[in-house]
Amino acid sequence: MTDTFWAFIGLILFLALLFYFKVPAMALRSLDERAKRIAGELDEALRLREEAQGILAEYQQKCAGIEQDVQEIITAAKHEAEIIVAEARVKTEEYVKNRNKLVEQKIAQAESDAIQEISSSAVNLAISSASKIINNELGAKKANDLIKESIIKVKTNLH
């Protein structure tokens, strides 16, 4: 009996003990459980991936909707800004027109006042000149009566 024979017998006994204690069945059961656990984890990972893709698609839709809303808001803001600028331009033009009209009215009033003052001065000068001429050529009493009468006529004609 050689050493190889005894090693073979030890191997046979070892394998017999393994089968006696049902080690291969336990190993198979353990491998089956591990395979089921891995399959469950794969199913869970697949489910989570699909859920993540659904959430991603939902957020992409929301993002697209938000971008569209932002564009609409920007467009509306630009439109309102254009309206405000146009209204401001119209109001400014009206203000300038009103100021010009007011200045023209003031100028016209000043011209009217100047003409009236010049007319009044001319009338007063004419009256005083006529008064001096009449006083020099007519008598004092007759000259005063004539002056009073002329002043009344001039005042009624001017006013």
UniProtKB/Swiss-Prot annotation:
TM region(s), chain numbering: 5-25
Keywords recorded for this protein, A-Z: ATP synthesis, Cell inner membrane, Cell membrane, CF(0), Hydrogen ion transport, Ion transport, Membrane, Transmembrane, Transmembrane helix, Transport
Subcellular location: Cell inner membrane
Predominant location category: membrane
Lipid bilayer topology: Single-pass membrane protein
Matches recorded under InterPro entries: ATP_synth_b/b'su_bac/chlpt, ATP_synthase_B_chain
Entry protein name: ATP synthase subunit b 1
Originating organism: Bartonella bacilliformis (strain ATCC 35685 / KC583 / Herrer 020/F12,63)
Gene coding for it: atpF1
